[in-house]
From Swiss-Prot:
Transmembrane segments: none annotated. Residues 60-70 have a biased composition (Basic and acidic residues). Residues 864-932, 940-967 have a biased composition (Low complexity). It comes from the Eukaryota. SMART domains: HSA, SANT. Residues 60-97, 264-283, 311-352, 587-621, 653-680, 774-806, 864-967 are annotated as: Disordered. This is Chromatin modification-related protein EAF1. Component of the NuA4 histone acetyltransferase complex.
């Protein structure tokens, strides 16, 4: 069963295609009087002789006489052979009946008028036929614009073909052509007549034209040969069936039995007597051993053809009866009355059967002969004498007028290029006998209709009852529903399938839906005498409950819920066509109502906890990828440098690469805010706990994994852990130093300096230390040697005793001129030290490296000052105040002693210890990576315990110092 959507869309496409063809031909001949006259004449002829209504032609009005009628040939008689088979007799009898002169009313009337006139039309398909309904270009353009195929095709189901898409493109071309024509009309450049078509020069047939002709001929030849082979196969199948049914004696050709000659041939007997045809003589018995001795030359049977030709002609071959038409016999009663065994007749082939292997012109009636003589004969290409000199002619090029525009091309030609406009009357053919009862008793028996059971379909859910849209039923819909219900015996699914709207265009409105339940509900409204208690089936109780709920809801609601019957008087004009417009109108009303209805107060948007500065500093994924790449690159460089470090001395520092910028900063990175002492202490404790937990987790993991990991991976993990541990130790040392310094200053009654003040003081110390170191170096250089980057005016030597005082005197000047040449040198040394720390520890951040560099510079300055005082012998006691020092401020030695514990390790010493540990691990190749990792973890735990003890000792010392002045 074809899908209704598919059938509907196919009808739309074919109708639209036909209209476009009409537009093409109308545009081809817009005001051509001869074309209009030809159309009118052809239309008048079709109205007079309606071939679709099977009307006969009026021979008196036929325009032309073809030829005079030929006399009917007389039928010759012949005596049948008594020895023929029963099957041949039956065939002969049937052929006699077929060859009996049978004349229809048309043929008799034609013979009486002697075929004075005859009508035969061979119409090419490219000539337009008159249309029953012609539309103008403007109307067709309006139709294609209001409902174009380009919008209908995407919503179609299972009907998307190439022809449909081509038709949609053709509609677009039509719109362009119409717009151009209207533009020319407004400009006054569109004339009522078209210019004469340009005649192209005559061209000869090319090789491609000959190939196309051969292709057409081969197609026809193969098609006809296939038909002939099918007919031959059918005849062979019938012959095999007769052979198995009637046997060899009735179906095979009777031949004379083989007569074998003796060894000695009597030539006298052979010359005297002729060979006699005796079918009753049995074959002589011959010894098989003797037969083998007969030569091939003597085994040939001598046949006298003159004797055979002189005998009376008989039908001894089935091929003769088929190839040559048999003549009727006058003694047909003898043949029919003979003793013929009753056998079922073979399948009779009608005269118009395609399996007829021969056709005789003598069997045709005069009208058929006249038509046969006038039919065109198909000949192979190139059969003419001068086929190459024949000019090529295209029937489409012979048109006198050109198309309106190149956008509208001619429609493709059909396969049946010639259409014969002559049909036989159906009165000449005997109608087939109809059965008395053409309808099946499966659905039409009275007993079944009396005992039919009405089953209810599945009802919808009752919770959607309040939102239901009523369906509209016209009078035609009600009558069709009642007819389908009676015809299909209350099969609601089939009734629903037949009640679906024919033209849906991919959308069905709610008022046009015809589901199984809606059909049953409307049928129940049309039959008020039917009781719901008579329903049967699994959904009978649910249907009763739904009907009761629907009646109750309809009584309480003002809106229509049940189906609505509409009469013809109440239908508005163009009701079905305006349903889409009403649907869009309803959509617009609902949108307008939604806009006008007051909306509830929206909740205030939640403010993000991130400030604007934090949002700006958030790194993007690209920035994070770059940071990750830089970090991996630095780690790789550090690993490469460590592999090259065993050749250096233990205290020697690796060279500083010059390609790394001094002020390197990652994108999105900002300096951390200042932290209080409590935050620093909490951060230090959290890092210690995290390190202890990580070490414990790593021990458990290594204990579980064992020797499964590769040694290279274990070494990389050891190095990563060493760098992390070293960075944590440096940060903890810095935190402890700051805490002890702040605690000591609180005990002395001083305000602890801010991070900015501490940084400025450190810079001053670094600058003073660099100046003192430079002056000390100048004292040791020989005369005339100037260091790089120093002016000759600065070559004055300073005594060692005045180095510290001069450094203290130059600090205010350096603070006042931070951008001078003397301040640039310490900054360069400081940046070089920061780069060196970052190369040694790639995981170390820029801020931590800067802090470590300041600490090292401060220690270096203190050491230089201590060495200078010892050299001068002016080392003051610990509690003595220097001149110029404010009261209540501790001396530098006291500050350095209180801020730097005795057991605090420097980064250089820690690097030396790490190198020694690596050498110890490399010197013990017998240990596995897991054992080395466990040993390293134990060493880390011991260092953590020592640091904890140092912190406790520092806290007790600070408490004792705080209690001393108070006492």
């Amino acid at each position: 069963m074809m899908d209704p959507r598919q059938e509907t869309c196919g009808d739309i496409v074919s109708t639209r295609k036909r209209r476009l063809e009409e537009l093409y031909y109308v545009s081809l001949h817009p005001r051509y009087p001869q074309g209009l006259d030809a159309k009118q004449k052809l239309k008048q002829f079709q109205d007079q002789f309606d071939l679709t209504q099977n009307r006969l032609f009026d021979e008196n009005k036929l325009p032309k006489a073809v030829e005079e009628p030929k006399p009917v040939p007389t039928l010759q008689t012949s005596t049948p052979d008594a020895g023929s088979s029963p099957e041949l007799k039956r065939r002969r009898t049937s052929s006699i009946a077929q060859l009996s002169p049978t004349f229809s009313r048309t043929s008799l009337k034609t013979n009486e008028q002697q075929l004075q006139e005859m009508l035969l039309f061979l119409v090419p398909s490219n000539i337009p036929e008159p249309t029953t309904e012609t539309k103008s270009l403007a109307e067709l353009y309006y139709t294609t614009q209001t409902l174009p195929l380009s919008k209908l095709i995407p919503s179609a189901h299972k009907t998307l073909t190439t022809d449909s898409y081509h038709l949609a493109l053709l509609e677009g071309k039509l719109a362009v052509a119409h717009a151009r024509i209207e533009e020319l009309k407004r400009a006054g450049k569109w004339g009522p007549r078209q210019p004469k078509r340009f005649q192209d020069p005559i061209r000869r047939k090319t090789h491609w034209d000959h190939v196309l002709d051969e292709m057409e001929w081969m197609s026809t030849d193969f098609r006809e040969e296939r038909k002939f082979k099918q007919a031959m196969a059918c005849e062979i199948a019938f012959s095999v069936l007769e052979y198995h049914k009637y046997g060899k004696e009735a179906c095979c050709v009777k031949t004379k039995p083989i007569k074998f000659l003796p060894e000695e041939i009597n030539e006298s007997e052979d010359t005297e007597s002729k060979m006699d045809i005796d079918t009753s003589m049995p074959p002589p018995s011959i010894n098989p051993v003797e037969v083998t001795n007969i030569s091939a030359a003597d085994s040939v049977t001598v046949v006298d053809y003159d004797t055979l030709l002189s005998q009376p002609r008989t039908l001894s071959s089935t091929e003769e009866s088929e190839d040559k038409p048999e003549e009727p016999s006058t003694d047909s009663e003898e043949v029919v009355g003979g003793e013929v065994p009753k056998r079922p007749a073979a399948p009779k082939l009608p005269e118009s059967s395609p399996f007829k292997l021969y056709a005789s012109v003598d069997k045709l009636d005069p009208l058929s002969k006249a038509l046969f003589d006038n039919l065109p004969v198909t000949t192979p290409p190139g059969s003419a004498v001068n086929a190459l000199q024949v000019p090529y002619s295209d029937p489409l090029d012979n048109s006198k007028l050109a198309p309106v525009t190149h956008l509208l091309a001619a429609p493709p030609e059909q396969d049946d290029w010639w259409s014969v406009c002559l049909e036989d009357s159906p009165a000449d053919e005997d109608p087939l006998p109809l059965r008395s009862n053409t309808r099946s008793t499966l659905f039409n028996s009275e007993t079944m209709r009396r005992h039919v059971v009405i089953k209810a379909p599945q009802p919808p859910q009752t919770k959607y009852l309040d939102f239901r849209t009523p369906t509209m039923w016209l009078l035609a819909d009600d009558s069709q529903l009642l007819r389908l219900v009676k015809e299909y015996s209350y099969n609601w699914d089939i009734v629903s399938a037949h009640m679906l709207p024919q033209k849906t265009y991919g959308f069905t409105a709610n008022i046009e839906r015809r589901t199984s339940w809606q059909c049953f509900e409307r049928w129940f409204q049309l039959n008020p005498t039917f009781s719901l208690t008579d329903l049967r089936g699994p959904y009978a109780q649910a249907a009763q409950q739904w009907m009761a709920a629907a009646a109750k809801a309809q009584a309480q609601s003002k809106r229509r819920i049940s189906p609505l019957g509409v009469s013809n008087e109440s239908i508005q004009r163009g009701h079905r066509k305006l349903r889409w417009a009403s649907m869009f109108d309803g959509i617009r009303k609902s949108m307008r109502k939604r806009e006008t209805t007051p909306r509830p107060n929206p909740q205030p948007p939640r403010k993000s906890q991130l400030s604007e500065s934090n949002k700006k500093d958030i790194a993007s994924p690209l920035d994070l990828c770059k940071m990750k790449f830089e970090q991996d690159k630095n780690l790789a460089k550090a690993y490469a440098q460590q592999r090259m470090m065993p050749g250096q001395m233990p205290g020697q520092m690796p060279p500083v690469p010059s390609n790394i910028p001094a002020n390197r900063q990652f994108p999105g990175q900002r300096p951390p805010p200042p932290q209080t002492a409590a935050q620093i202490q909490a951060h230090t404790q959290a890092q210690a706990r995290a390190a202890a937990a990580a070490s414990g987790h790593m021990q458990q993991r290594m204990a579980g994994v064992g020797m499964n990991r590769m040694p290279g991976q274990m070494n990389d993990q050891h190095q990563m852990m060493q760098f992390d541990r070293q960075r944590q130790l440096m940060e903890q040392q810095k935190m402890l130093q700051q805490q002890q310094q702040q605690q000591f200053m609180r005990t002395q009654g001083q305000v602890p300096p801010q991070p900015g003040q501490v940084q400025g003081q450190v810079n001053q110390n670094v600058q003073g230390a660099q100046v003192a170191a430079g002056q000390a170096g100048m004292a040791q250089r020989p005369a005339g040697q100037i260091p790089q980057g120093q002016m000759p005016a600065q070559q004055g030597q300073v005594p060692p005793g005045q180095a510290g005082n001069q450094a203290q005197m130059m600090r205010p000047n350096m603070r006042m001129r931070p951008g001078g040449p003397q301040a640039a040198a310490p900054n360069e040394h400081l940046n070089a030290l920061i780069r060196q720390l970052q190369n040694q520890n790639p995981a170390l951040s820029l801020e931590a490296a800067t802090k470590l560099a300041h600490v090292q510079v401060q220690r270096f300055v203190q050491k230089q000052q201590r060495v200078a005082r010892q050299a001068q012998g002016q080392t003051p006691p610990q509690g003595q105040m220097r001149p110029g020092q404010p009261q209540g401020q501790p001396s530098p030695q006291m500050r350095s002693g209180s801020s730097t514990p005795m057991n605090m390790q420097s980064p250089q010493l820690m690097n030396v210890q790490l190198q020694q540990q690596q050498q110890q691990r490399s010197a013990s190749p017998g240990q596995s990576p897991a054992q080395q990792h466990a040993m390293l973890m134990r060493m880390n735990q011991q260092q953590q315990q020592q640091q904890q003890q140092q912190q406790n000792q520092g806290q007790t010392q600070g408490q004792n110092q705080g209690q001393g002045p108070s006492e």
